[in-house]
């Protein structure tokens, strides 16, 4: 008997949702950084064994939006509640329950689907503090299970996955066993470039960046995959930061991104990077759609 199911990973920004998904999948599906709101789109991670398939949906961190992009991200996250049988509500062990958590809990109660509370980053707290966190959240909602983990170190992750397997119902194998995500290679390439921008820049720059893959094709002469990407920013000053002195920052972004893209594609890559200014794109719906933040997602 084959069993399958869809599982959403929900929570505030920076609680470790993407780290968890990447650990379960055994490779990078979702980009990671220490910046809030790193994940902007829903990312599917397809975990398949001989007898089960769990389709994880990693979601943007739920926050109080200040732009049209923020609205898109939050609605995209909540839309998964219509698509899944189980929700993993992830919270950090080293932060007390806040208004953001309470807001999510109210939406989860209204959704009327099983919710597993996942308390991440247990490696950062004393066991007594963890017990306080468990008691506090337990008083707010009737969770199906409460599972403390460390997604970074892998502590208890297998236990959580086994719990999900045990609760799967008989179902179809929705995706081939060798497919690990629903996103095309172009999307993954753009995300890998954006990840390097997030790692290398500060303040408002990371949040103001979108990456568009203009072209991606094999060069018959060099036998490399030739990729041209454009990094979009909102202001000229941000463009200057991305390019850097004598182009040094842009070269660094390109070098680090190319390495990851080559690992993903298993191929040699020539990566061409450009930077353009598109003023206030985060509040323009047409620009959002052009850059891959489309309402079709929800």
Curated annotation (Swiss-Prot):
Region of interest (G4), ranges: 120-123
G5: region residues: 149-151
Entry GO terms, CC: cytosol; plasma membrane
Region of interest: G1: 11-18
SUPFAM superfamilies: P-loop containing nucleoside triphosphate hydrolases (SSF52540), Prokaryotic type KH domain (KH-domain type II) (SSF54814)
Domain Era-type G: 3-170
Similarity annotation: Belongs to the TRAFAC class TrmE-Era-EngA-EngB-Septin-like GTPase superfamily. Era GTPase family.
Function per UniProt: An essential GTPase that binds both GDP and GTP, with rapid nucleotide exchange. Plays a role in 16S rRNA processing and 30S ribosomal subunit biogenesis and possibly also in cell cycle regulation and energy metabolism.
Protein name, as recorded: GTPase Era
Organism per entry: Streptococcus equi subsp. zooepidemicus (strain MGCS10565)
Gene from which the chain derives: era
């Amino acid at each position: 008997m084959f069993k399958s199911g869809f599982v959403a990973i929900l929570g505030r920004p920076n609680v470790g949702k993407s780290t968890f998904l990447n650990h379960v999948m055994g490779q990078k599906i979702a980009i990671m950084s220490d910046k809030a709101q790193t994940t902007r789109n829903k990312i599917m991670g397809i975990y398949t064994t001989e007898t089960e398939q769990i389709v994880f949906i990693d979601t943007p961190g739920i926050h109080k939006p200040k732009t049209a992009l923020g609205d898109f991200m939050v609605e995209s996250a909540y839309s998964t509640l219509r698509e899944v049988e189980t929700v993993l509500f992830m919270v950090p062990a080293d932060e007390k329950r806040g208004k953001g958590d309470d807001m999510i809990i109210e939406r989860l109660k209204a959704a009327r689907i099983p919710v597993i509370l996942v308390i991440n980053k247990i490696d950062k707290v004393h066991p007594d503090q963890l017990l306080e966190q468990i008691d506090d959240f337990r008083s707010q909602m009737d969770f199906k299970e409460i599972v403390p983990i460390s997604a970074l170190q892998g502590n208890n992750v297998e236990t959580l996955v086994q719990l999900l397997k045990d609760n799967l119902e008989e179902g179809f194998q929705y995706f081939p066993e060798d497919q690990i995500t629903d996103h095309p290679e172009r999307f993954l390439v753009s995300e890998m470039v954006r990840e390097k921008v997030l790692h290398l820049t500060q303040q408002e720059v990371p949040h103001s960046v979108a990456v568009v893959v203009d072209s991606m094709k094999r060069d018959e002469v060099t036998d490399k995959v030739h990729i041209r990407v454009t990094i979009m920013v909102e202001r000229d000053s941000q463009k200057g930061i991305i390019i850097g002195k004598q182009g040094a920052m842009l070269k660094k972004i390109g070098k680090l991104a190319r390495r990851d893209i080559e690992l993903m594609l298993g191929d040699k890559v020539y990566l061409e990077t450009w930077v353009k200014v598109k003023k206030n794109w985060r509040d323009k719906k047409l620009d959002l759609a052009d850059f891959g933040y489309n309402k079709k997602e929800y």
